[in-house]
Amino acid sequence: KIKGNPTKMEGTVYSILIICGISHFLNDMIQSIIPSIYPIIKDKFDFSFAQIGIITLMFQMASSILQPFTGLYADKHPRPYALSVGMCFTLIGLLMLAFSENYLLILLSVSIVGLGSSVFHPTASRVAQLASGGRKSLAQSIFQVGGNGGSAIGPLLAALIILPFGQHAISWFALAALLAALIMIRLGAWYKARLVYVVTHPQKNVTLNNDISKRAKYGALLILVLLIFSKYFYTSCITSYFTFFLIDKFGISVQASQLCLFVFLAAFAIGTVAGGMLGDKFGRKYVIWFSILGAAPFALIMPFANLFWTLVCTFLSGLIIASAFSSIVVYATDLMPDK
């Protein structure tokens, strides 16, 4: 059983990895709803693109910029059930967003939704690594593909549920948040037992990379952070404005634009899995270089292509950009395995 005192603490705990992947799927599916509703709220409230950008800024600050701080706190003060608490924030934010009727309330709502994600990611990633049994690339791939799969399916669900029925239909996704919170209780129970197990069964062979200076570690980590920043900058631009670009340039419907966004996000999910496998086979460094350089030509071609080739370029750029995520994260955990 997973709950209570788990019977398996050593080796790869596949049941926990699968639950981590499912939790990540639900979390990122909910998070991807935010940019998916931009066309709705822009038309309903007559927002400018600058106002949409500020909504994205508030959402990203809460969901991404806060993550290092919540992760630092989680390192020093592990809270196994913080996963469920974070998802409760997301649930509250969704309900607020569904019934927000002014700009400030929308900003507050998306910030609360983002805060839930910021609490979720560091602890869930730690649980996945603890359950890996040393197979870090496998664990990271399972965890990441869950999140990217959720990000891909979110716009489809928005097109099927929110676009036809309006802003209030966002409240239906609170059920997904509730389900995720319940699932995360089981993760929290395993994590709590694991913390006790680590205290009573100290590891003798944990390598902390003490032969590398702290300055070199943080220098390498800074490079990895800059790489992640550049990739998320591009990804955030696509998820926030790609639908508007397609609607304006090609005159397609909002529903069709969401399906086109799904093409990018699906490629992102595929690229994460493929990149993890290629990194293990050919070396993470080469995958990272390919990811940095390979997407640029398609991004440059995209504004000048017709709809078909725009989607082809979108798919290929998403595939290539996502390929390095697992490698970058594993590099970071190898640099600082104790954090």
Task: Put a short name on every predicted segment.
Residues S32, Q60-P68, S151-A152, L265-V273:
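Residue-level signature of mid-helix packing/kink "hotspots" within the transmembrane helices
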